[in-house]
């Protein structure tokens, strides 16, 4: 198991409405990268659960790539997912992560050629993130058979890392289905939507359950 902590960004291209909204709320509340790293540090002080940051390259460039990964590691972060930084084009990110002891987790999609899946597996560490659909987070999975075929094929190519699947996974049934070949499933938008509903309804008792 691991926890994924989002790094708010004003233009989260891969995200659906739930995470776009959460980013807007965080940014309008004044959340900075330093604040996000402090949240990670506070979490690490009370938990050994692996912690993964997910965000975008631009705020990290502004922060300073090397400084970011060093500070992430000292804050207890185990890995980083950057959907808009392909590992081949973002070699500086990859090297900075490696030097700091932070996993650089790359993504593949149903449209990713087999030879590139193999290359991404070689470059990545932690796990390879298999995007279930060509779209944004929180989208409907639709027909699952093409996704299962894609995951089965991807699993045969990914030899160096666990294969995790995400995007559009909402229910326990989704998790069971998607992990027939993947090593695990990532639930993001569904949880963010639940948190928003609880926050707007002030439903503390439901949150506790």
Placement of each model-derived feature along the sequence:
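Active-site beta->alpha loop and helix N-cap motifs at the rims of alpha/beta catalytic domains
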Residues: 2-3, 7-9, 18-85
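Glycine-rich phosphate-binding active-site loops on the catalytic face of alpha/beta enzymes
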Residues: 2-12, 75-81, 86, 130-139, ...
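Hydrophobic faces of well-ordered beta-strands that scaffold small-molecule active sites
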Residues: 3-5, 51-55, 80-82, 104-108, ...
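Alpha-helix-loop-beta-strand connector modules within alpha/beta enzyme cores
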Residues: 16-52, 95-105, 109, 145-163, ...
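Glycine/Thr-rich beta-alpha phosphate-binding loop at enzyme active sites
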Residues: 19, 29, 117-153, 194-200
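Catalytic beta/alpha-barrel core
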Residues: 28-31, 76-89, 103-112, 137-140
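Glycine-rich beta-to-alpha transition loops that act as phosphate-gripper elements at the mouths
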Residues: 54-62, 86-87, 108-112, 164-172
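Catalytic cores of alpha/beta
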Residues: 112-122, 157, 165, 169-185
């Amino acid at each position: 198991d691991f926890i994924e902590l989002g790094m708010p960004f004003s233009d989260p291209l891969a995200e659906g409405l739930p995470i776009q909204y959460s980013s807007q709320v965080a940014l309008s509340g004044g959340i900075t990268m330093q604040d996000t790293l402090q949240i990670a540090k506070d979490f690490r002080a009370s938990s050994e659960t692996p912690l993964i940051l997910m965000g975008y390259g631009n705020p990290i460039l502004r922060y300073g790539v090397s400084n970011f990964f060093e500070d992430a590691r000292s804050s207890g972060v185990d890995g980083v997912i950057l959907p808009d930084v392909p590992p081949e084009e973002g070699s500086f990110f990859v090297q900075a992560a490696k030097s700091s002891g932070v996993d650089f987790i790359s993504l593949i999609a149903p449209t990713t050629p087999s030879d590139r899946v193999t290359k991404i597996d070689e470059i990545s560490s932690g796990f390879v993130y298999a995007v279930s659909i060509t779209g944004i987070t929180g989208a409907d999975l639709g027909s699952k058979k093409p996704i299962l075929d894609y995951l089965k094929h991807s699993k045969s190519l990914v030899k160096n890392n666990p294969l995790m699947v995400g995007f559009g996974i909402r229910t326990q049934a989704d998790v069971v289905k998607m992990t027939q070949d993947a090593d695990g499933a990532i639930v993001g938008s569904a949880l963010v939507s639940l948190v928003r509903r609880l926050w707007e309804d002030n439903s503390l008792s439901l949150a506790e359950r």
